[in-house]
Amino acid sequence: MAGAVPDNIDKPAYTGAPPPSGLSADEQHAYDQLAFFYKHGLAFAQEMGNRPQTLYGIEDSPIGLASWILDHDARSYALITRIFAGQEEGLTRDDILDNITLYWLSNTAVSSARLYWENKLGFFSPKHVAIPVAVSVFPDEIYAAPRSWAEGAYPKLIHYNKLDKGGHFAAWEQPQLFSEEVRAGFRPLRK
């Protein structure tokens, strides 16, 4: 979740330093997930954040595009490997191949990578959002934001829920769950 990682967590996780003492079990778990991402999954984000227009291999070759999508970080690779092995993960092999085809036929792989360039790094750092915010924590996301971090980053937190399944592409992987969470998140705003 963007904007919720406290500085005293983000910096040590990024540099490989030990975590601060006194973390709750949820905070320690999130710290470990962030440290893993920084060590094993950040290179693709850095490339797209710094030089998205140099990713010609994903525009010029359907195999290059498939390779980039299927193996851009260790957690996504593990999820896709389980799906291609026939395990139920909310997505099917056809869903993944359809997604690759959509990027290929619309020629939007590099333009979609520009989102990283436009946002640069520091993506996880607090942004001090002052409007009502709803947070849904999916277990296979890059990190599972603890309630304490969400409350610190979003003073007007109106909904927080930890779910049993779903990941970085929750709306795609678990559309029913995602829809239910959107409804639950906006429900407190209805008058």
Regions found by a protein language model. Give the residues of each.
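C-terminal subdomain of alpha/beta-hydrolase-fold enzymes, centered on the catalytic histidine
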Residues: Q46-K191
